[in-house]
Swiss-Prot record:
Keyword check for Protein transport: no
PANTHER family: UREASE
E.C. designation(s): 3.5.1.5
Protein name: Urease subunit gamma
Subunit-level organization: Heterotrimer of UreA (gamma), UreB (beta) and UreC (alpha) subunits. Three heterotrimers associate to form the active enzyme.
Record pathway: Nitrogen metabolism; urea degradation; CO(2) and NH(3) from urea (urease route): step 1/1
Organism: Halalkalibacterium halodurans (strain ATCC BAA-125 / DSM 18197 / FERM 7344 / JCM 9153 / C-125) (Bacillus halodurans)
Entry keywords, A to Z: Cytoplasm, Hydrolase
Amino acid sequence: MRLSPVEKEKLFLFMAGELAKQRMDRGLKLNYPEAVAILSCYVLEGAREGKSVSELMKDGKHVLSTEDVMEGVPEMLEEIQVEATFPDGVKLVTIHEPIQ
């Protein structure tokens, strides 16, 4: 299987997101990279499902709470930006203050 660099990046991100979900399901608090992975996967999968940029920006704030992550992570993650492929092209999705 031959993957482009962008496809490889999305695959690694998906794998990191799945690992983070497993850890969260076991009751572990997520660190910074795990939180970024889960939020990024949410955006990529949401775009694939046909959600709009505005829906993802709004709903992305409710994916993780401060109780899901380690101390200090919400302050380190002021915003997240993900390039996602929508039916009408690639768009940048920005979620401000994604962990509340």
